[in-house]
Amino acid sequence: MFGRDKIQIKTPAQIRHMRQAGLVVADIHDALKAAIAPGVTTAQLDEVSARAIEKGKAKSNFLGYYGYPATVCTSVNEEIVHGIPGQRVLQDGDLLSCDCGAYVEADGVQWHGDAAFTAVVGNYASETDKYLDRTTERALWAAIAALAEAGVSGWKDARINLIGDAVESVVFDAAQETGHELGIVEEYVGHGIGTKMHMAPDVLNYSVSSKG
């Protein structure tokens, strides 16, 4: 999906532009989290996202992307990713994933931010849902920690697959501790970002034998 282009290396100044876009995305997340509640429609959440982007003086990199009709993806329960906002009314206990992005322009160049989060609407519907949500968050932080540790060591012998290794390790350990095994979605991957929203490298959420 994202091609086989080389990884785009950024300068410190370019990273600052990306941070500006990322801060707008963080503001979108905050606005969405404040709006999520039983009775709210996913279309209303899209309106919240659009206002946050406008307030941040940025532009949506979701709206119009390959014809996508909204500024946020709202995936509820069984919807894994890329759910389109509409008249679906959120119910207590729903698990909701919100994926959104924004870009800023500097010297005629777009710099993109893109991030997702999962929230429970009201209260968890079951202990299983709670276990899924909490384990997924633990896996996220384990992957971030693995990258941070690699950075501190100067990226010596570091490989992109350490992210998938960290995620799968958390999922495996959780299954060993509780006896409840969770699956990892392999049909979708993470991605690089920069002057485009989707760039190299593809980032797998599971362990692979090859290094890279």
Over which residues does each language-model region extend?
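Active-site neighborhoods and metal-handling regions in enzymes and metal-associated proteins
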Residues: 1-212
